[in-house]
Amino acid sequence: MKFAWLLAPDTYWDEKKTFITAALESGIDHIVDTADSGRIKKLGNLTLISPDEDADIVLVGRDGEGDGTLELPETLEYSRDIEMASELSESGRQVAAYVEIRSKAHEELARRLGRVVDYLILVGEDWKIIPLENIIADLQEEDVKLIAAVADVDEARVALETLEHGTDGVLIEPADISQIKDIAALLENIESETYELKPATITRIEPIGSGDRVCVDTCSIMGIGEGMLVGSYSQGLFLVHSESLESEYVASRPFRVNAGPVQAYVMVPGGRTRYLSELETGDEVIIVDRDGRSRSAIVGRVKIEKRPLMLVEAEYEGMKVRTLLQNAETIRLVNDKGEPVSVSELGEGDRVLVYFDESARHFGMAIKETIIEK
């Protein structure tokens, strides 16, 4: 998963606090700083990267060989940064190394540090022309996260997307707060998956009695065309629409998906599924729109209540899938035109959007195995 850290600006406290607060509000909770550790820790539940011994991740290289404060020795066997990083790592501490790529010798310093630290921050005056990909390739087999220092969203995009391998994360050195928000939005877009939704034809729809159904209330507002992928079969999940439309019976609840009964699968991050009954406050689910674009959302509450259910069966190119939904006018699927349609108005021959996955599932993970669901 790609990530971003913030390098706190070297300025007076009130301005620094504004940048850190903006980062936290944008979901960036790893802060690199060398001067105000105590005050920063009071701003929220964050991870501090600092040379201080009480830091969550200890930083080496600032005021050392990594940033040019100390000259590199003739042989890296006598490198102060490598020695410090090795000692900290051996003592069980998480370590981040900071290296400005000033020369071939600094490239080699970065490679050596990448073999002993948890995180390696790479910095260059114009880092796009340094051999970043070579360093990435050399360290691919190592258990280290590579981070490129960037000033704006364009540099972040190159680091995370354009390079053949790309870095694991970026260290933001922003000139203004808008750059923090732009990079946070870029990360969300990079991490989002696209699901290929197919128009499946309804072959059967009928009431079947009562059962325990699950409403998933998220911490996000969903728009028209958005919902969750839910189904009785892991190999075929229906796009169940959010309660984002007004009804003559109830007010809209755009944070909610009335998803189905307790045994149904729901798509969650990482290409996994979970049972609806497993979800609880703080879990993550995937919100998908009618074009298959996705984003993650936090579960704020799950409500399980006994309600009348109906069976929906659909078929696409010989693949037949089913799901159960509450039998109510406010429960909607999404038709092949991308429009929400109430289950009370659906009939045989109508087409709705379904995500098909030929993989079998074991504890929610996709596996290559033959499985029959019916």
Curated annotation (Swiss-Prot):
Q: Does the keyword Oxidoreductase apply?
A: yes
Q: From the UniProt record, list the reaction(s) this protein catalyses.
A: 2-amino-2,3,7-trideoxy-D-lyxo-hept-6-ulosonate + NAD(+) + H2O = 3-dehydroquinate + NH4(+) + NADH + H(+)
Kindly list the biological process annotations in GO that this record carries.
amino acid biosynthetic process; aromatic amino acid family biosynthetic process
Q: What Pfam families does this protein's entry cite?
A: DHQS
E.C. number = 1.4.1.24
Q: State the InterPro entries in the record.
A: DHQ_synth
Query: Is the Nucleotide-binding keyword given for this protein?
Result: no
Keywords assigned by UniProt? Answer: Amino-acid biosynthesis, Aromatic amino acid biosynthesis, NAD, Oxidoreductase
**Could you state a single Gene Ontology molecular function term?**
NAD binding
Q: Describe the family membership recorded for this protein in Swiss-Prot or TrEMBL.
A: Belongs to the archaeal-type DHQ synthase family.
Function, as annotated: Catalyzes the oxidative deamination and cyclization of 2-amino-3,7-dideoxy-D-threo-hept-6-ulosonic acid (ADH) to yield 3-dehydroquinate (DHQ), which is fed into the canonical shikimic pathway of aromatic amino acid biosynthesis.
Q: Which PANTHER family match?
A: 3-DEHYDROQUINATE SYNTHASE, PTHR33563
Q: What is this protein called?
A: 3-dehydroquinate synthase
Q: Which organism is it from?
A: Methanothermobacter thermautotrophicus (strain ATCC 29096 / DSM 1053 / JCM 10044 / NBRC 100330 / Delta H) (Methanobacterium thermoautotrophicum)
The record lists the lineage as:
Archaea, Methanobacteriati, Methanobacteriota, Methanomada group, Methanobacteria
